[in-house]
């Protein structure tokens, strides 16, 4: 199973944005 660079980049971007959203949610509490 080969993962293209574009797919890996999109996965990292989605994961990063999820982490940022989680951190901002915790800070707002």
Swiss-Prot record:
Segments traversing the membrane: 6-26
Topological category with respect to the lipid bilayer: Single-pass membrane protein
GO cellular component, one term: plasma membrane
Compartment(s): Cell membrane
Superkingdom classification of source: Bacteria
Protein keywords: Cell membrane, Membrane, Toxin-antitoxin system, Transmembrane, Transmembrane helix
Induction annotation: Accumulates by 2 hours post-innoculation and into stationary phase in rich media.
Coiled coil (UniProt feature): none
Function: Possible toxic component of a type I toxin-antitoxin (TA) system; an overlapping antisense RNA has been identified.
Note: Encoded in the skin prophage.
Protein name: Probable small toxic protein BsrH
Organism: Bacillus subtilis (strain 168)
């Amino acid at each position: 199973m080969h993962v293209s660079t574009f797919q890996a980049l999109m996965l990292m971007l989605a994961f990063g944005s999820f982490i940022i959203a989680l951190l901002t949610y915790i800070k707002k509490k």
